[in-house]
Regions:
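Short amphipathic alpha-helix that is part of the acyltransferase structural core
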Residues: 2-42
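C-terminal/domain-terminus segments
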Residues: 213-226
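Class I (Rossmann-like) S-adenosyl-L-methionine-dependent methyltransferase catalytic domain
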Residues: 192, 202-203
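Core catalytic DNA strand-manipulation module of type IA topoisomerases
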Residues: 196-199
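Conserved beta-hairpin
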Residues: 29, 43-63
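Acyl-donor binding region in acyl/amide transferases
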Residues: 16-19, 62-194
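Short hydrophobic/aromatic beta-strand or adjacent loop that forms the aromatic wall/cage
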Residues: 44, 203-208
Length: 226
């Protein structure tokens, strides 16, 4: 569907933000996000940006992909994995007014402050895809560093984290105690060996954090000063 918004009259204040189920926002993310994927997001809170009955933006907040990743942010007052949430997917259609994304993020931050006990939001901007985090700077996130360079697997137009080739068959492990590769891992390994897939080195990602309480904000600011 092609959305037409009159830039001369439309304002971000004409838009509404709703919390929606994952299955409502996922098709929108798959259509409009550069990754064309909503899989593996560990979704916890999903939001839709609406205009005159049409969804014009989608956002997914979820828990970290790696279980102990939250510990990196304990220096900002995070005591367990349920006190930090990651902004994992954000996209709006092209035909939206300036500042639409920052308005969208701002409204969801207000919602999270009011309805949850998270201490910080974390998001990553990937230079490999031409992103430096401009939208996060515009919404007053703090840039706190870079992740280490990594590798991804490019296969059939999809990109997979290189850890996917180390996934194990959990059902087999529970049944026999034997560790064997998951079928998805075997498929990627075979594709790499045949040349159908390739391993691509990627630069580190920009790390942005948004404090949701005064204590975390103080700790973030102090860490940047020091």
């Amino acid at each position: 569907m092609l959305f037409q918004i009159d830039h001369t009259t439309a304002s971000v204040t004409d838009f509404t933000v709703r919390e929606v189920p994952f299955n409502v926002v996922a098709p929108f993310i798959e259509k409009w996000h550069y990754s064309h994927s909503a899989k593996g997001q560990s979704p916890k809170h999903c939001f839709a940006l609406m205009h005159e009955g049409d969804m014009i933006g989608g956002m997914i907040y979820g828990f970290f992909a790696m279980r102990n990743q939250w510990k990196k942010y304990s220096v900002y007052g995070v005591d367990d994995e349920f006190e930090v949430i990651e902004l994992r997917r954000l996209v709006c259609i092209d035909e939206t007014p300036r500042n639409t994304e920052s308005y969208f993020i701002g409204q969801t931050i207000k919602w999270l402050k009011k309805n949850t006990n998270y201490r910080i939001i974390v998001s990553y901007a990937d230079p490999h895809h031409g992103h430096a985090g401009t939208i996060y700077k515009a919404t007053n996130f703090y840039h706190v560093g870079m992740t280490s360079p990594g590798k991804i697997i490019d296969y059939n137009g999809q990109r997979y984290h290189d850890k996917c080739i180390r996934d194990i068959n959990k059902a087999h492990l529970r049944k026999t105690g034997e560790r064997i590769p998951a079928q998805s891992a075997v498929r990627l390994i075979n594709a790499l060996e045949s040349g159908e897939a390739k391993m691509v080195e990627t630069p580190g990602k920009h790390i942005y954090v948004m404090p949701l309480n005064k204590k975390s904000k103080k700790l973030i600011v102090e860490s940047l000063v020091n």
